[in-house]
Amino acid sequence: MSSTHSNNVGHPQSSPQGPLTEQQRAQQQYQIFENSLPKVSQSVYQMLLNEMVPLAMGIERQISGDVISSDSNVTSENGNINNMIKRLKIEEHHTVDIIRSHNLIHELYKADEEEKEKVLARLRNIGFQIGLKLSELLIFSNNPNLKFKEMDLLLIMKFICRDVWKQIFGKQIDNLKTNHRGTFYLLDYDYRPIQSFSLEEDAKNEELKMIEPFLEIPVGIIRGVLSSLGYSSEEVICLASFIDRPTDRPKTAFPKGVSFHVQVTMPQ
């Protein structure tokens, strides 16, 4: 995909009356930084995010098949994940089975809990790595001395709701709720990657269950951002669930919103 840049970058603009404050200069510099970032097609980007789910299932399917076909006497040392991945190398002229994405998603829905959890963990890890990289992009690349750990946790969650979400999904979180004791609910009534999924308002639980894996990447993103700011995996619990959308919002093809429940263990 070729990247495009804003046509306005580099064009002179009229300066506001009077000298700029330090805050205004910082905002102006950050705007220039954002405009300089390469742009990609939003539709293609969301398709790429969604394809991570069947891809994760396909990898697990291949790993599982490789383990089953391997010698039953393989030692635990040779059976670790690194060796499994090495055995996945595609040799020259090797035929690869192509499975349609929707078949892999249905296969994931039918999988047992152990296999399903492996796939979901892989998706969360993808999101976690995105969160780490995004923190570096939005924070540390511009201000290495910024220490979020010294800030109020609520400000950090607002940063996720505003800056992180907008950078990844092109919109902010719609609502943030908290009890001010480490519990937060990030409510996205129009989570964009699943808006193209058409469901009836009275969608059955089975249909929603098949879509739940698509929520694991943003769960991982939240955990990754918090980890980069000093909150370890042991301190953070993050879960996602479908919720009813407010009645005053316009109807969309996907009738449910998403609630991201974040619990951060507060220091004593």
From Swiss-Prot:
It is found in: Golgi apparatus, cis-Golgi network; Endoplasmic reticulum; Preautophagosomal structure. The modification N-acetylserine is found at residue 2. One of its GO terms (cellular component) is TRAPPI protein complex. The keyword NAD does not apply. Disulfide bonds: none annotated. Keywords: Acetylation, Autophagy, Endoplasmic reticulum, ER-Golgi transport, Golgi apparatus, Transport. One of its GO terms (biological process) is retrograde transport, endosome to Golgi. The keyword Acetylation applies. It comes from the Eukaryota. InterPro entries: NO_sig/Golgi_transp_ligand-bd (IPR024096), TRAPP_component (IPR007194), TRAPPC6/Trs33 (IPR037992). Residues 1-27 are annotated as: Disordered. Pfam families: TRAPP (PF04051). Belongs to the TRAPP small subunits family. BET3 subfamily. Part of the multisubunit TRAPP (transport protein particle) I complex composed of BET3, BET5, TRS20, TRS23, TRS31 and TRS33. Part of the multisubunit TRAPP (transport protein particle) II complex composed of BET3, BET5, TRS20, TRS23, TRS31, TRS33, TRS65, TRS85, TRS120 and TRS130. Part of the multisubunit TRAPP (transport protein particle) III complex composed of BET3, BET5, TRS20, TRS23, TRS31, TRS33 and TRS85. Component of the TRAPP I, TRAPP II and TRAPP III complexes which act as guanine nucleotide exchange factors (GEF) for YPT1. TRAPP I plays a key role in the late stages of endoplasmic reticulum to Golgi traffic. TRAPP II plays a role in intra-Golgi transport. TRAPP III plays a role in autophagosome formation. Required for sporulation. Has a role late in meiosis following DNA replication. PANTHER family: GEO08327P1 (PTHR12817:SF0), TRAFFICKING PROTEIN PARTICLE COMPLEX SUBUNIT 6B (PTHR12817). This is Trafficking protein particle complex subunit 33. It comes from Saccharomyces cerevisiae (strain ATCC 204508 / S288c). The lineage of its organism: Eukaryota, Fungi, Dikarya, Ascomycota, Saccharomycotina.
